[in-house]
Design a protein with these regions (language model features):
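Claisen-condensing/thiolase-fold acyl-transfer catalytic domains that form or cleave C-C bonds
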Residues: 1-5, 12, 72, 76-82, ...
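Active-site-adjacent elements of ketosynthase-type condensing enzymes
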Residues: 15-29, 35, 144-145, 191
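A short alpha-helix capping/helix-coil boundary motif
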Residues: 97-98, 128, 174-176
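Short acidic/glycine-rich loop or secondary-structure boundary segments that cap or lie
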Residues: 18-19, 56-57, 97-98, 142-147, ...
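Alpha-helix capping at helix-to-loop junctions
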Residues: 5-6, 14-17, 54
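Condensing-enzyme catalytic core mediating Claisen C-C bond formation in acyl metabolism
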Residues: 22-119, 124, 165-168, 207-213, ...
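Short gly/pro-enriched beta-turn/loop segments at secondary-structure junctions
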Residues: 3, 41-43, 127-131
Length: 245
């Protein structure tokens, strides 16, 4: 929006074994995992963020026109999505410290930060849950999801019918024993690129509030027994008519 860059790549990744070794226990140790534990996702996702037509200049518009023409010439215009996802708004999150110190229960540490961001988004843009097709958090897991929904109900906002968590969607709880669900930077990124954006492109979802969640800890702070604050930034994603239409 400010015009500092015409085109930016944003990507994130995570790896199960590296996260276990750094923040929990070596895999060969064979420790028992509590049910509140999430399973770090080995995955990644990358999106390209472009400026709008007002800021992108002639080169950007020409590139879009060439891409559309190439699809038509190749007989693949139907492969181009009907709607192009765009960032229509953002709500920066604030650090929320709930005095959590258990690295085996990250969902509880991050849930209230997600609540704070969602409520702030409602206040900033004068919106309510029904204004969104989905409100999607990052990696709260099953434990964090229940905490989130409880706090939202206490605030007078019931989002249970439209809430989705990337960590829960990543794995099948019936066939994959990942306890509370998935976690990690790659979890939100992979679900965003592989599931959420295609839904917007197909026109099934018109407006989505995407709230990736994070826990602020390091190997040193964890070993010292310090608190694990949480943070969550919110991005509103909407579908606009594609340039190829």
């Amino acid at each position: 929006g400010a015009g500092y860059a015409a085109r930016v790549l944003a990507l994130a990744s995570s790896h199960f074994a590296s996260a276990e070794r750094q923040f929990r226990f070596p895999l060969a140790y064979g420790n028992q995992r509590p049910q509140s534990t999430t399973w770090t996702v080995t995955g990644c996702g990358c999106v390209m963020i472009e400026g709008n037509e007002k800021n992108e200049g002639k080169d950007g518009r020409r590139a879009k026109e060439n891409a559309s023409e190439s699809l038509k010439n190749a007989g693949q215009e139907k492969l181009h999505p009907k709607f192009q996802p765009c960032i229509s708004a953002a709500t920066p999150g604030k650090i929320v410290d709930m005095q959590m110190r258990d690295s085996m229960n990250m969902g509880a540490a991050m849930a209230v930060a997600a609540v704070d961001t969602i409520l702030q988004n409602f206040r900033d843009f004068n919106r309510k849950p029904s204004d969104y097709d989905r409100i999607i958090t990052g990696d709260l897991g099953m434990v964090g999801k229940e905490i989130l929904l409880d706090f939202m109900r206490e605030a007078g906002q019931d989002i249970s019918s439209i809430h989705m968590d990337c960590g829960i969607e990543m794995f099948d709880p019936k066939t994959q024993d990942t306890h509370s669900g998935g976690s990690g930077c790659g979890c939100s990124a992979a679900v965003l690129c592989g599931y959420i954006l295609p839904k917007i492109q197909a026109g099934e979802w018109k407006r989505v509030l995407f709230v990736p969640t994070g826990a602020l800890l390091s190997q040193i702070s964890f070993n010292e027994g310090q608190n694990v604050p949480g943070i969550a930034h919110g991005v509103v994603l909407e579908g606009k008519e594609s340039f190829g239409e």
